């Protein structure tokens, strides 16, 4: 039995609280069970140098964990003087995922930065960041339209992500920390609302996984992500 008595295909209790902070164009507190991430979207005029004059926008991301978001305190990366490899990998994943949701040509020469700060970690922080940041991004784009800076919303659709894995021989969706740390196979899946995949990151921590197990995990992820899409739509409808 899973720690919270969840069914194998069940996502943890999910909450998306919009307008969580007052300054950012978009802000969302996303909670998957005990994992809590604050996602903010900041709009700035102009684009990176490599895009200047091309008439398109850019979406980037930063990710970080508060020192006591985990069981024991981790020093801030700023105090260490550099970001770790895990942090860089995750923020690139978040940015890639959210760029897929937007027509950058229609965005024009604006840059949107998504800041994902983990308040409390209990597994799935990168996937929670993507799912929460998507809602913050939607609010930021709506603000650009409402303020007359864009004629039409360039968002192509929602993006969501979930972790899946094999634990004690069983395929599970939305792993919490105790499951993730014991997983024989761990996978993160990012999808568009229409079912197309943006990213699949899968690793065999123990025994290699079979083709059939891969397909089963992807099907499990699709079901979990559909649940997240429903929550995103409900949050944006408020």
Curated annotation (Swiss-Prot):
Phosphorolytic 3'-5' exoribonuclease that plays an important role in tRNA 3'-end maturation. Removes nucleotide residues following the 3'-CCA terminus of tRNAs; can also add nucleotides to the ends of RNA molecules by using nucleoside diphosphates as substrates, but this may not be physiologically important. Probably plays a role in initiation of 16S rRNA degradation (leading to ribosome degradation) during starvation. Its EC number is 2.7.7.56. This is Ribonuclease PH. One of its GO terms (biological process) is rRNA catabolic process. Phosphate binds at residues 86, 124-126. InterPro entries: ExoRNase_PH_dom1, ExoRNase_PH_dom2, ExoRNase_PH_dom2_sf, PNPase/RNase_PH_dom_sf, Ribosomal_Su5_D2-typ_SF, RNase_PH, RNase_PH_bac-type, RNase_PH_CS. It is an enzyme of class 2 (transferase). The lineage of its organism: Bacteria, Pseudomonadati, Pseudomonadota, Gammaproteobacteria, Enterobacterales.
């Amino acid at each position: 039995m899973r720690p919270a008595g969840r069914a194998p295909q069940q996502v943890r209790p999910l909450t998306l609280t919009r307008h969580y902070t007052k300054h950012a164009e978009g802000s969302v507190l996303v909670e998957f069970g005990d994992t809590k991430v604050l996602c903010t979207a900041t709009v700035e005029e102009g684009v990176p140098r490599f895009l200047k004059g091309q008439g398109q926008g850019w979406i980037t991301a930063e990710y970080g964990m508060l020192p006591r978001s985990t069981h024991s305190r981790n020093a801030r990366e700023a105090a260490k003087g550099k970001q770790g490899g895990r942090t860089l990998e995750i923020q690139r994943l978040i940015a890639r995922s959210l760029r897929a949701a937007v027509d950058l040509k229609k965005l024009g020469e604006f840059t949107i930065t998504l800041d994902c700060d983990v308040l409390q970690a209990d597994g799935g922080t990168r996937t929670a960041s993507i799912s929460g940041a998507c809602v913050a991004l939607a609010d930021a784009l709506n603000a650009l339209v409402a303020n007359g800076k864009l004629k039409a919303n360039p968002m192509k659709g929602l993006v969501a992500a979930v972790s899946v894995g094999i634990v004690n021989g069983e395929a599970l969706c939305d792993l919490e920390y105790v499951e993730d740390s014991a997983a024989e196979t761990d996978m993160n899946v990012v999808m568009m609302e229409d079912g197309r995949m943006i990213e699949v990151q899968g690793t065999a921590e123990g025994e290699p996984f079979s083709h059939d197990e891969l397909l089963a995990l992807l099907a499990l992820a699709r079901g979990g992500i559909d649940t997240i899409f429903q929550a995103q739509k409900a949050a944006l409808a408020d």
